Amino acid sequence: MSIFVANKEIAERKDIINPNLINNSATLNGFFNAYGDLPQIDDAKYQGLRVINQTNMQWRGSGPYMYVQKGTYTFSCYAKTSGLGVKSIMIPLNTGLDGKDKQPATVNTQAMAISSVSDWSRFDCTFVVSEAGYIHPRVESSGNNDVLLLAGFKLEKGSVATPWCPSINDLATGLLDIQAIKSKLGGVKLLYRIYYATSLKEVA
């Protein structure tokens, strides 16, 4: 099953969207760095998504903590960067910090460098989990004076990155919120639509 908020053209192309396994990827609720700090949120949004501002933050990347089973996964996000430090997508727990109370997953990819880009670009990293456990997908910078803006985190099964979408849980919550608004307004029809697409693919 693939469920997401998007336009009709995308919704009808059932072959290109995989469910997002990350909850709250638009709001960034439940995102932390290895020290337990909440992410710094930028005032601006990108495509309606809240933006993590990791400017001047060395090795303090924020992301969700997730328990994953064995298999192949792809992580992707939007990024806008500058500065001389190396920026990298990191998947495993930060050994010695956030791995103290969590069983870490065994993954074949420790880090994947991404380029510095002055305009928003989407980056992705495919990795294989050989032993189930926790991961902490995030983007880190090695420099103290770098600009690193991030949005639209997505984790999906398989080796292909597909367009960002909310998780199925997020969409279900959104539908309940919409129903509550409609009831409050006396059944007034809202001026937008939520499209969804389904297939027989396993998602959990």
Question: Which residues make up each language-model segment?
Answer:
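Extracellular polysaccharide-targeting segments
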Residues: 1-30, 140-202
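Extra-cytoplasmic beta-strand recognition segments
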Residues: 27, 55-89, 123-128, 152-153
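Short edge-strand/loop segments of extracellular domains
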Residues: 92-100
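Short, surface-exposed loop/turn segments at beta-strand-coil junctions that are enriched for proline
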Residues: 82, 128-132, 142-144
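Extracellular carbohydrate recognition and processing domains
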Residues: 100-134
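Secreted extracellular polysaccharide-interacting domains
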Residues: 50-69, 88, 100-110, 135-138
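Short carbohydrate-recognition loop motifs
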Residues: 36-58
